[in-house]
């Protein structure tokens, strides 16, 4: 069975940015701000939970799972972005990321137009910044898309 691909209207509007070091700092027109991911890493106890999980499953298994999840997430991110930019070739789809893409495609098909992908955004008042996967028109509204993948998707 062949999956039908949609063609999206492209609207130009992206801008450049510079990222420095770790933790990630975005250089915005309003100043330098830490990334949202860096802020969340400081205020959550994620490292302790990951260390306990790593100890429970073993270092080798933890590395394997982490590497596979990272590769799958990167592939899916690439598929989603290319799809929104009308650049995805069916032959690129592979493995578990292909299955995930086929599950999220129905939501991407609700997009009316792609404004920009990989867009840096910031809040000068609260002094944080980040990058979203896409800004699109959806249901006649500007909408931010940002991929977050969980194992049970």
Please place each PLM-identified region on the residue numbering.
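Metal-dependent nuclease catalytic cores that hydrolyze phosphodiester bonds in DNA/RNA
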Residues: 1-129
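Mg2+/Mn2+-dependent nuclease catalytic core
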Residues: 115-153
């Amino acid at each position: 069975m062949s999956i039908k691909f949609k063609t999206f209207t492209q609207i130009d509007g992206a801008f450049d940015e510079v990222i420095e070091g770790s933790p990630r700092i975005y250089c915005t027109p309003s100043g330098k701000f830490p990334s949202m991911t860096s802020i969340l890493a400081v205020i959550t106890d994620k490292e302790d939970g990951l260390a306990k999980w790593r100890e429970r499953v073993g270092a080798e298994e933890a590395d394997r799972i982490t590497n596979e999840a990272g590769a799958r997430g990167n592939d899916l991110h690439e598929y989603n972005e290319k799809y929104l930019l009308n650049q995805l070739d069916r032959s690129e789809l592979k493995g578990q990321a292909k299955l995930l893409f086929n599950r999220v495609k129905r939501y991407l098909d609700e997009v009316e137009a792609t404004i920009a992908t990989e867009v840096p955004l910031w809040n000068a008042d609260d002094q944080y910044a980040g990058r979203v996967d896409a800004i699109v028109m959806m249901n006649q509204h500007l909408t931010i898309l940002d991929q977050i993948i969980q194992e049970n998707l």
